[in-house]
């Protein structure tokens, strides 16, 4: 008898988890938004920067601390496998300057469409949108199911399962659904949650020249971060200077 697995969150990670688990198990993919891939839709300014075509060392050198943590996952499914996965799902890709990989169409909706195609092809996967997970049920250290609330009728119902995959993302963009729910559930199931801190932050610059350039998007900008004589970072890329209200 096939195992029953619940995947919470239908972003890129959740959809990939459902597709993989669906090869050998019955999967219920639950999304609280009315559609899948809401954050994926806006990434890369709507173009969806899928991955980078660089060597493994490029990835590991970009991880500020504890890059060894990424070794097993990266070598199990590296960037080339990601690209092959999407192209086989009818989402052709292109490589731009700096090794950045985008869909040929420049539309993130094509990446989402590739995931949806693979989900729809697999009869072992059921997708449930507009449904919010309220609780992960545990007994004697074992996950036994989830409690959900469907938006349409506001009624709570329990769903039994053998395992739960939490793919709810962080808490960086609440408007897309990343509200930090996964941390709360993990803690209640016995995991230790460390204090969170943002990994992507804006720079506030005092110089008047930056204020004069508000609203511009610049290409091939070199960034050097130094403290005293020590240089911490050198990077080149696109620089966006938002307009302050």
Q: Where are the regions a protein language model picked out?
A:
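Redox-cofactor binding/interface segments in oxidoreductases and associated redox assembly factors
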Residues: 8, 42, 166-167
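Short beta-strand-to-turn element immediately C-terminal to the catalytic PLP-Schiff-base lysine
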Residues: 42, 50-52, 148-149, 187
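Predominantly flavin-linked oxidoreductase catalytic cores and closely associated redox partners
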Residues: 110, 117-244
């Amino acid at each position: 008898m096939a195992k029953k697995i619940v995947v919470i969150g239908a972003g890129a990670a959740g959809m990939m988890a459902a597709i993989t688990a669906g090869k050998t198990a019955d999967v219920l993919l639950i999304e609280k938004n009315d559609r899948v891939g809401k954050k994926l839709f806006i990434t890369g300014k709507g173009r969806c920067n899928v991955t980078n075509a660089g060597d493994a060392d490029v990835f590991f050198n970009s991880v500020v601390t504890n890059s060894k943590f990424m070794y097993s996952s990266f070598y199990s499914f590296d960037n080339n496998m990601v690209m092959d996965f999407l192209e086989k799902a009818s989402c052709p890709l292109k490589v731009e300057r700096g090794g950045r990989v985008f869909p040929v169409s420049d539309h993130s909706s094509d990446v989402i469409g590739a995931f949806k195609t693979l989900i729809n092809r697999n009869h072992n996967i059921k997708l449930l949108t507009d449904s919010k997970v309220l609780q992960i049920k545990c007994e004697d250290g074992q996950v036994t199911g989830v409690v959900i609330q469907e938006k349409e009728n506001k009624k709570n119902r329990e769903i039994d399962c053998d395992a739960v995959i939490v793919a709810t993302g962080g808490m960086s963009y609440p408007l897309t659904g990343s509200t930090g729910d996964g941390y709360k559930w993990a803690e209640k199931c016995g995991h230790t949650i460390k204090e969170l801190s943002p990994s992507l932050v804006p720079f506030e610059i005092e110089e008047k020249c930056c204020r004069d350039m508000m609203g511009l998007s610049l290409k091939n900008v070199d960034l050097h971060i130094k403290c005293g004589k020590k240089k911490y970072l050198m990077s080149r890329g696109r620089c966006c200077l938002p307009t302050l209200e």
